């Protein structure tokens, strides 16, 4: 019986190789760990993809990103392709906001800016300033429409999006 038990443990898989790296992307420090034979290569690929998504799509502070352009659209309708990541993420954000009865609000970008969360200088905005900024928030100010060719997105009444609350997860 003892020999049988020992033979079973010998048949188990050995611990997988792992590689860990600390990465700064999306205004956040992240620890990535990848397991498997090609862990280092997979980690390199994951880090590259994170930076690409951040800079090209999800950053609201990088002038070349899709989200930056949408936030700067001043209420103009923006067209997106059917396979674009941004409208799918906006749809998910709106769904989560609805499910949480507004506790999660992706339209708080101006409020976050007022506090200085994406800048080097933090400050406490006045109650009047916050009241004014909050008048431009709420998911009702995001018009997301599925079209035959993809999506259209319109941010109404000065609304701006920050998708950091879900883009990282």
PLM region spans:
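Sec-dependent N-terminal signal peptides
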Residues: 1-3
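C-terminal motif of bacterial Sec signal peptides marking the signal peptidase cleavage site
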Residues: 6-10
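Short, conserved phosphate/pyrophosphate- and ester-handling motifs at nucleotide-, phospho-/glycolipid
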Residues: 168
């Amino acid at each position: 019986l003892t020999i049988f038990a020992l033979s079973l443990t010998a048949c188990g898989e050995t611990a997988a190789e792992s590689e860990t790296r600390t990465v700064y992307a999306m205004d956040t420090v992240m620890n990535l760990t990848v397991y498997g034979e090609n862990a280092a290569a997979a980690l390199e690929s994951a880090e590259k993809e994170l930076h690409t998504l951040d800079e090209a799509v999800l950053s609201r502070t990088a002038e070349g990103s899709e989200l930056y352009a949408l936030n700067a659209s001043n209420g103009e309708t923006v067209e997106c392709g059917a396979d674009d990541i941004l409208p799918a993420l906006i749809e998910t954000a709106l769904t989560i906001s609805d499910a949480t009865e507004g506790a999660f609000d992706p339209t708080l970008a101006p409020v976050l800016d007022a506090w200085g969360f994406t800048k080097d200088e933090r400050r406490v905005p006045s109650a009047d300033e916050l009241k004014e900024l909050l008048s431009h928030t709420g998911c009702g100010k995001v018009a997301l429409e599925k079209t035959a060719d993809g999506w259209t997105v319109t941010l109404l009444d000065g609304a701006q999006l920050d998708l950091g609350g879900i883009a990282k997860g």
